Amino acid sequence: MHLLRTLLLRSNTSNISLLTKCSFRASPLHKWPISLRSGSQISLLPTEQKKWLHSQPKQQDTATKTPVHDLPSGIQHQSEETSPSARSSISTDPSSIAEEDPLQDQSIGLLKRFKKTFRQHGKVLIPVHLVTSSIWFGSFYYAAMQGVNVVPFLEYIGLPDGIVNILKNSQGGNALTAYAMYKIATPARYTVTLGGTSVSVKYLRKYGYLSTPPLVKDYFQDRMEETKELFTEKMEETRDIISGKMEETKDRISEKLQETKDRVAFRKKKNEDME
């Protein structure tokens, strides 16, 4: 009896397992998510063959944004504040920079400064240059009369032998020696001329004999105002001419319309009288 019961139980359990397997296979499968670990899933899809799809875990962004209030105080102040030099460079307007006087401009060479001063203050520079040049040449001529020999100095500074031989073998005497010294001292002469011109210009401006040149910004602004006024006047004249022509055309059209109306009314009246 015991053996029969055991056999019956085993047969029943095997039948039950077979039934469950068959029912599992026959039942429609939609989606069976199985959580293996955090962030990954295995899905069983209703297809003819079993496909196991692994969904990758969502990766978090490694680069996290730090809010502004979490930054250190030093970095936060540096990001919010702008350096004074940057502010000054931004706020600097090129039109506000005035043209520098060539007598005070040390950024250009001596010869360029001399030419620029000649173009701007030629009436003052020419007399100053003549006076200083006369003093320079007279001083060198007097030195040549006293026996000053400039030939060793010319050989020392490395001038060509042709120029040195001309001075050695020339019969010009003191005048040629003075002229050679005068040409050698050209940088010093130009410097003295510019200094004398600067002093003379300041003196003449102080006592009203020489007007102060306007700034470039003011000059261009005045020219722009003059051009604007001329343009406005021309526009007003053109507008008046156009408005006059339009009024004349309007009057002519009105006259023609009135004549046409009168003719039409006259014809209508005439036809009515005839009827």
Curated annotation (Swiss-Prot):
Transmembrane segments: 124-144
Region (Disordered): 51-100
Positions in coiled-coil regions: 221-275
Protein's membrane topology: Single-pass membrane protein
Record's compositionally biased regions (Polar residues): 56-65, 75-95
Gene symbol of the encoding locus: fam210a
Localisation: Membrane; Mitochondrion; Cytoplasm
Entries under InterPro entries matching the protein: FAM210A/B-like (IPR045866), FAM210A/B-like_dom (IPR009688)
Family: Belongs to the FAM210 family.
Species assigned in the record: Xenopus laevis
Annotated protein name in UniProt: Protein FAM210A
DUF1279 domain span: 105-217
Disulfide bonds: none
Keyword hit for Aminoacyl-tRNA synthetase: no
Xref: Pfam families: FAM210A-B_dom
Lineage of the organism: Eukaryota, Metazoa, Chordata, Craniata, Vertebrata
Top-level division of the source organism's lineage: Eukaryota
